């Protein structure tokens, strides 16, 4: 069989790499893909943009038996609705269900309706009432642009000056284009974050391995938020007890609530959670797709066929399958372009990929392209060096061995990915 993966990031390279391992799969097409998917075994890039929905459907109808969607934008735009109208097998939520990511205000109101634990919040479209609420609440406080802002439309303000600036920026200045025309202001939650990703078939849920990502650009979680600078799996904060609480208090009520409201959810569902000291989870955000960079370490740990799991989900039979995992921890370190998450150069030649490929581990491509036979940078997050180990510290060391082989003008990465789990291993926390 042939499979189409929609997207061009590190997540899509990891999904394509995993799908290609299934012996039944002859070819994996990636639209539009990157330099990593261009050279991956059994994979081929197709020059179709992720938002060219009609072209994607035409291609899928002629060439593949199954489509898996990577990024959020085509989901929110209705790619699943279009494929289903044409009778094409595709794994992902409809546009209605993808509102869980497409609108933070929709999500907060949904959580409140279904009594799913989350931070206290209010929605605003005008500056003055928003500022008045800030002064009532005090800092630290969180300000979020309502729509899709590539994971960067969230400001954690540690004082009221920062909070006011963020509100004025998003509402008066519309810093994030249309996404900022409404803001959600919510309480600052204390605790440890975890990424809890599941597959959903409309009714049944199959949990993926847990993970934790590192949103801040700098070591020690300093600097601005990014799309994610690295991740590890599993997340030790999600104990067996916390795992069950997340399913009972967050995931099942969400899947039931969406179905009750006429938005039956199929696809990957990613709950970004804050776990407090007592093990109680609260929802920070939902994403309607696999996380990036969490996909990379999670796919390295997945021993089951991803294709089989997706087929089970499309047959509404996720209760009949189990996923098997390598128990060893895996760490992924993102190599980024100088200046990210602000302005950065593109087109820098990347060296050392062959040396890294000779080591244990896997370098997944994200913002890369092929130019005159060379791999060059084409995005802010460029690569993700991913390795497995007997411990988190062993996996981390191996991931950094891979990263150290790779060079380009302006390359940088965090040096402390996995630090919380390593502190736990050493009995420091």
Curated annotation (Swiss-Prot):
UniProt keyword terms in alphabetical order: ATP-binding, Ligase, Magnesium, Manganese, Metal-binding, Nucleotide-binding, Purine biosynthesis
GO BP annotation list: 'de novo' IMP biosynthetic process; purine nucleobase biosynthetic process
KW RNA-binding (keyword) present: no
PROSITE patterns membership: ATP_GRASP, GARS
Cofactor note: Binds 1 Mg(2+) or Mn(2+) ion per subunit.
InterPro entries, per database record: ATP-grasp, ATP_grasp_subdomain_1, PreATP-grasp_dom_sf, PRibGlycinamid_synth_ATP-grasp, PRibGlycinamide_synth, PRibGlycinamide_synth_C-dom, PRibGlycinamide_synth_C_sf, PRibGlycinamide_synth_CS
Pathway(s) this gene product operates in, as recorded in its UniProt entry: Purine metabolism; IMP biosynthesis via de novo pathway; N(1)-(5-phospho-D-ribosyl)glycinamide from 5-phospho-alpha-D-ribose 1-diphosphate: step 2/2
Molecular function terms, GO-annotated: ATP binding; metal ion binding; phosphoribosylamine-glycine ligase activity
HAMAP family per record: GARS
Record protein name field: Phosphoribosylamine--glycine ligase
High-level lineage: Bacteria, Pseudomonadati, Pseudomonadota, Gammaproteobacteria, Pseudomonadales
